[in-house]
């Protein structure tokens, strides 16, 4: 539970700092709302985790809105999110990111579930200079491309087990430890 609270706090901080750091004149503002966009897997092979990601985004936005929103330029705004189902398809995810930016006019994106889908969307958000807070893409390669508009709340996947392995070695008196890791290569 403590880890969940920590991740939630990091997510809230990242989204608030990202939006607060950019002038509100660039934001799509509907009345007193800043509109965020997200191409996310609601169907297809990533749908289970995509729905969890959407629930997390909704929980964060609901909490921010209940706390009065975010202050930008001395004015408070609440958030609204436009979602499109990327069908767990990278090509579709990139198309929907383009649609959210060009047709819907969003100026802030919330990332999809999966490193592969994030890899498809990141070039689009970079092209249009749209900040994207990424909650679930963790492939190391995402962080070696020099993206200026991609902000992550997780450490890269290659760091997930470092602490656990160090602890296992320590508990084993420094002797070699055998481990196995299974993963999907989707990025």
Located regions from the model:
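Short, low-complexity disordered leader/linker segments with a strong preference
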Residues: 1-35
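Short amphipathic alpha-helical/adjacent loop interface patches that line ligand
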Residues: 12, 57, 61, 97
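Acidic/histidine-rich, surface-exposed loop or edge segments in extracytoplasmic proteins
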Residues: 37-45
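Redox-cofactor binding/interface segments in oxidoreductases and associated redox assembly factors
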Residues: 38, 111, 181
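An alpha-beta-alpha
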Residues: 42, 148-187
């Amino acid at each position: 539970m403590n880890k969940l609270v920590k991740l939630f706090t990091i997510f809230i901080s990242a989204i608030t700092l990202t939006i607060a750091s950019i002038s509100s004149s660039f934001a799509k503002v509907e009345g007193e709302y800043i509109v965020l966009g997200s191409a996310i897997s609601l169907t297809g092979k990533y749908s289970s985790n995509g729905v969890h990601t959407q629930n997390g985004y909704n929980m964060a936005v609901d909490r921010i809105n209940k706390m009065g929103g975010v202050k930008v330029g001395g004015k408070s705004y609440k958030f609204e999110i436009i979602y499109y189902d990327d069908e767990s398809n990278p090509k579709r995810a990139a198309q929907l990111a383009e649609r959210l930016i060009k047709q819907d006019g969003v100026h802030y994106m919330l990332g999809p579930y999966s490193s592969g889908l994030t890899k498809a969307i990141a070039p689009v958000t970079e092209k249009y200079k749209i900040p994207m807070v990424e909650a679930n893409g963790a492939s190391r390669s995402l962080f070696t491309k020099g993206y200026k508009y991609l902000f992550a709340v997780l450490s890269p996947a290659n760091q997930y087990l470092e602490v656990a392995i160090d602890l296992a070695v320590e508990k084993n008196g420094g002797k070699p430890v055998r481990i196995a890791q299974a993963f999907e290569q989707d990025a």
